[in-house]
Amino acid sequence: MARPLSFHEDRLFPSDPATRSYARGLYALVKDLPIISPHGHTDPSWFATNAPFQDATDLLLAPDHYLFRMLYSQGVSLDALKVRSKAGVPDTDPREAWRVFASHFYLFRGTPSWVWLNHVFSQVFGFTEFLEASNADDYFDRITAALATDAFRPRALFDRFNIETLATTEGPHESLQHHAAIRESGWGGHVITAYRPDAVIDFEDERSPRAFERFAETSGQDVYSWKSYLEAHRLRRQAFIDAGATSSDHGHPTAATADLSDVEAEALFNSLVKGDVTPEKAELFRAQMLTEMAKMSLDDGLVMQIHPGSHRNHNVGLLNSHGRDKGADIPMRTEYVDALKPLLTRLGNDPRLSIILFTLDETTYSRELAPLAGHYPVLKLGPSWWFHDSPEGMMRFREQVTETAGFYNTVGFNDDTRAFLSIPARHDVARRVDSAFLARMVAEHRMDLVEAEELIVDLTYNLPKKAYKLDQRPDWARPATLRAAAE
Amino acid sequence: MARPLSFHEDRLFPSDPATRSYARGLYALVKDLPIISPHGHTDPSWFATNAPFQDATDLLLAPDHYLFRMLYSQGVSLDALKVRSKAGVPDTDPREAWRVFASHFYLFRGTPSWVWLNHVFSQVFGFTEFLEASNADDYFDRITAALATDAFRPRALFDRFNIETLATTEGPHESLQHHAAIRESGWGGHVITAYRPDAVIDFEDERSPRAFERFAETSGQDVYSWKSYLEAHRLRRQAFIDAGATSSDHGHPTAATADLSDVEAEALFNSLVKGDVTPEKAELFRAQMLTEMAKMSLDDGLVMQIHPGSHRNHNVGLLNSHGRDKGADIPMRTEYVDALKPLLTRLGNDPRLSIILFTLDETTYSRELAPLAGHYPVLKLGPSWWFHDSPEGMMRFREQVTETAGFYNTVGFNDDTRAFLSIPARHDVARRVDSAFLARMVAEHRMDLVEAEELIVDLTYNLPKKAYKLDQRPDWARPATLRAAAE
Amino acid sequence: MARPLSFHEDRLFPSDPATRSYARGLYALVKDLPIISPHGHTDPSWFATNAPFQDATDLLLAPDHYLFRMLYSQGVSLDALKVRSKAGVPDTDPREAWRVFASHFYLFRGTPSWVWLNHVFSQVFGFTEFLEASNADDYFDRITAALATDAFRPRALFDRFNIETLATTEGPHESLQHHAAIRESGWGGHVITAYRPDAVIDFEDERSPRAFERFAETSGQDVYSWKSYLEAHRLRRQAFIDAGATSSDHGHPTAATADLSDVEAEALFNSLVKGDVTPEKAELFRAQMLTEMAKMSLDDGLVMQIHPGSHRNHNVGLLNSHGRDKGADIPMRTEYVDALKPLLTRLGNDPRLSIILFTLDETTYSRELAPLAGHYPVLKLGPSWWFHDSPEGMMRFREQVTETAGFYNTVGFNDDTRAFLSIPARHDVARRVDSAFLARMVAEHRMDLVEAEELIVDLTYNLPKKAYKLDQRPDWARPATLRAAAE
């Protein structure tokens, strides 16, 4: 007999009764607000085709590196979890994979995955017992059965989750066919894209040659020549904007920027295109391209997102056997003050530009990022990110950033996820942690309750809409209520 | 109708009733103790001339980079706030500037400025409504009217604020005329100076040539020759000591120290004086001068303060248009263990020397500073500084420093401010946060209440007096009570 | 009349009543569990000879650098505390030294030493008044008298402290005679060793030449030839395993690892042995030897412990007068992601290897260590260490590590101490802080109480036994209950 899954309505609120009471009141103001998800990695084909998801392992376990990295760290093989390797998807029985997961679920105690998964299990699927070995089959069967119903198809879940806007991420070398299909389908869900050009900027990425080929096709430009390479970016940015994009997204190893002359930049590009790639030149080119992207933003208005500091695919053995993105990305020490100076010297006071900074190095919150964002008009701070998208991580972000940057140089929450079913859970955690933080401010008389009430709504809804320029829906997008009424 | 300004008597105390009760009791022991302000940047001419302050904008807004940097970060122009540029003070109507400030006051939610300003508004000026757009004019008028009265002249406020000692900061190239005037005025307020020689030590500072010229005048020495350059320092240090100084103050980019031979040091100086300035040589000279200053302290007893780690005037556009110190100083990663070793190897065990270290890089609290101060007899730790002079920042300082360095290797609070009216507010915050920290220690049975009671008085009053050698007033300085009786 | 020493049963528990109640309940489950001490620095001769300890100063003060570093930082001379210098033990009256300590005991307020010492005073010696100048003699006399009794001999205390396993640390060049004596004595206390080869790996350590000589003797190998140097390690590791060792221990300046070819490694070793020592070559050799040790672990199963980041003996004057290990070790910024990559690329996925990482740089908890341990099967995280072995330090460890690495990639508590009497105090603090952390999780509904109950037992007892492979006692070791029955 498994333990009852009591997913408490006061979860994540401080235990002190006065503070908890304020937290409850603040959370009540925002718990039913629509979800703004301006930065994430869901698959647009889900919403284009609206095909049902397959089974519990295929949807929840095998693609989620948060989950399989933890199990891998404890000696569980990725094959046993049905995680795709370079040889393809292992032929592990998905039910067996789910059993392995269930019997190791205790590993997630104290992690945000515990909160997210139990939210999904209880709120999305209606389970009332904690997952464990004894009920693994019941979980697997009931989830798989639910997924076969219309109520669990992607669009139905999108509506049920009360998502107002959902951004995916694509590269300039990728087609936007699924976004076109969504737009033309008449469904009306506001699914947009974001412009992530890393693969055609990073000459050290082994995927770069193929991405350049496809970039030439999608843009119709000679992308091996500097001026038309830039023109290709301009054209694709516009195509992304036509597909709803309001932001670009840049995941570089460091925050380095540069401000080369046109002649220098062209010479650097030519050298790299010819295959003369050194780490220094690749880094300088990435740095220069952040400034080039910023210059394009002056004209087309895309908000820039910069999130540096991950050592990608650190586990060489796993990269060789399983390829990229298998939970082996490790944060590195990151520097912003010198790194951003060339770009900021060029454009830091330009009212047409908006840059959202992220970090995996929490030491920069109070030392670098809050002082920068609390001064430069072009800078804002993205929420605590990736490993730090967690109750303690979010609280540290607020505690270390707010006193210098205030709340209004931050941009609300990003779920940044490809785990579609966890989106409501992640936003719920953010709303609860922000409520808890503000509740403490009120309980300690550092803020008036009226101010906290305004702030919780701003942090949840108004700031992300404003920061990501999502204030207006395009004609083809309609609120879920209208979609529901139309059905 | 604006919201009532309820500035609660329990502000900044933890909400848990037991802890709050201890905090109240501890705070009650120190809330009326005199203010010791051993490190700050108020203008000594205020106390020398005792001329009235001008208006709300001129006193509270335009000179305060904490305030205008936040508004600037949100797109408000400095001209609209009447902040001086290189072209002079903008002719903005001060009332209009105040209105802009009032309508953006919500930006300061969650920041220490919110606490400080509401303290000033309610406790110094008696306002009972929160500042907002609707009452901006009322605020402006009442503040400006109050400032015209004798009760709001600098000396009257000094007495009302119960300041026992206030240190300003001057350079060796600057006159101490205002301090002389204060001393000779018969007023009796204990306003002293501190010796800050950065401008005649940092050959990379563009103000350095003019400072050297004036240093030659104030010292009567050939400051372009190494031996008389050092003699000029010795003479000016003594003049500062005669004007009450008990400390020197060193704001270098890094904490680097050096221990060159006399021959090496002289050669380095000669090279720099001849204009052969490279970043490496300028850095080495700053490093060597910290050791030279320490050697002079052995003889004259000045306490050294070292606070490295700020990238000054990071915003190049703003530096060009508005000059230095416009809220664009950004902290950098800072290293102490290797940097201080030359000086500590030379003098680290000398009982005649006392060095107070500050940081803008909070990661050094537990890793470097507390271990250093918990071992070396010459080292003590200054309070959380600048961006970290805030409730969360102060609490992090105590939490991260105390377990290794204890309380008695710290030196109490520094307000470090040029915002004279905020001095009581800042000291009040420090007293409250220390009370809250000690209250938690007591509530968690990690300290006896008797010990906490001794400590709160030590942290507030005894430690700063001892660390800054302020145990004795000079003959010309008299307590406020005597000054009041004399009037 | 000194204050009563009220060492409260709720110490270190949060004040919030609901949280405290959970903390009490969790702590009750583990407070009487046996102590597993898999990493420490007690002297095995104590347990081999079972000779009585001498007096309060000799046992508690003079050898404890946590204590005398704090007093030294406040100007107390080491001679006054009877701390051994290069000239020998000062002839200070031990009672006088104890009086100096007592009159400065207030310096330890807020530090873990305060908690540990008051635990020892009240729980081990039965004092009921806080130590202060007025009762210094009473403390000295009563402690010294107690130490002369059989109940305070090392083995009796070992039993009374309910220690199940205690590991000491020896070098490969050192004899294991005391461990042999313990094993053969019939006493049955499970005192084991750990393999710490730093002195024969670090060519920059001035003790290295003498250590190599002794290494040749203990191993019977030509340790100046690469292949037999490695063989000497293999032989000594096996001898340590025979003396109960389950782990090796590596205290390097950095976490650097290398993976040289055999030819490169041999050439490097030959060059160093010939005396051609540069910092770069010494560092590379240390780096390579971590990989060599890991390779040997594949065969012999020793768990590797790596704890980098201390600048040893920073105070040059004190090193000259008093020698090493006098409280002047200062942590440095430490990097793991690049540093460990060579070793992890070679062996990071090998199920035969287990590495426990420690740090003195808390910034690496959430940025580097938790992400590494939350992915690599060979990595686990040691507890907060040295300066961070403290209530706040332990809490930061849990708060910053758990969300990414979970609990099961950590290994429970290490006391890491040579202060034998403080071992129960230190483990008690860890149990209380873990109880407090878990209590908050439960009170905030982030974990089920049943899970927290399982976890507190795992963190206290099961994880260290498993991580250090202490699941089985050897034949010669018997539980304290059996030893007691036998007497």
UniProtKB/Swiss-Prot annotation, chains A, B, C:
- What EC identifiers does the entry list? 5.3.1.12
Please name the GO terms of the biological process aspect recorded for this protein, alphabetically: D-galacturonate catabolic process; D-glucuronate catabolic process
Q: Which GO terms describe its molecular function?
A: glucuronate isomerase activity
One Pfam annotation, family name? Answer: UxaC
Q: Which Gene3D superfamilies match?
A: Metal-dependent hydrolases, uronate isomerase, domain 2, chain A
Q: In which pathway does it act?
A: Carbohydrate metabolism; pentose and glucuronate interconversion
Q: Does the keyword Isomerase apply?
A: yes
Query: Superkingdom of the source?
Result: Bacteria
User: Which residue pairs form cystines in this protein?
Assistant: none
Q: Which reaction does it catalyse?
A: D-glucuronate = D-fructuronate; aldehydo-D-galacturonate = keto-D-tagaturonate
Provide the leader sequence positions.
none
Task: From the UniProt record, list the coiled-coil ranges.
Answer: none
**Which keywords does this chain's UniProt record carry?**
Isomerase
Q: Which SUPFAM superfamilies match?
A: Metallo-dependent hydrolases
- What HAMAP family does the record tag this protein with? UxaC (MF_00675)
What is the similarity comment for this entry?
A: Belongs to the metallo-dependent hydrolases superfamily. Uronate isomerase family.
The entry's protein name is: Uronate isomerase
Source organism? Caulobacter vibrioides (strain ATCC 19089 / CIP 103742 / CB 15)
Recorded name of the encoding gene: uxaC
